[in-house]
Amino acid sequence: MNDVATTNQSEPALSEPQQTVAGVGMVQGRGLMHGSEVELQIQPAPAGHGIVFERSDLDPPVRIPAVVDYAVDRDRRTVLCDGEVVVETVEHCLSAIRGCGIDNALLSVNGPEIPLGDGSADPFVQAIQDVLSLIHI
């Protein structure tokens, strides 16, 4: 499934201005489901890339686009899956990305889930605002 396009109808057309972050934002902490320490890096990406999660702890790293085609049904959390590779609890991170107007970013995480933080989107918003000099691409 990794060959599927990373854009969908809710994302801007390539002819429209798109935005990414100007640097790397980071969120660290424990995951909710597994409880392990994880780090999420919010990295710039080129126009048309979309929002893509990367499991950097795997060799080779596996990328999973944040589109509905990769969503799987799990209780009380949003999970993206490509084959056996999952990224869990992505909902607050994706809310922050969308709310901050980011169209393209590589979200690199070194484990199977996103850090919980305080249970809201705020830690992700803060990480984005740290590198929020948005680049129009």
Placement of each model-derived feature along the sequence:
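N-terminal basic/disordered segments at the start of proteins
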Residues: 2-63
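N-terminal, charged/glycine-rich beta-strand/loop interface patches
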Residues: 32-34, 44-46, 58-132
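Conserved small/polar residues in nucleotide/adenosyl-binding loops
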Residues: 135-137
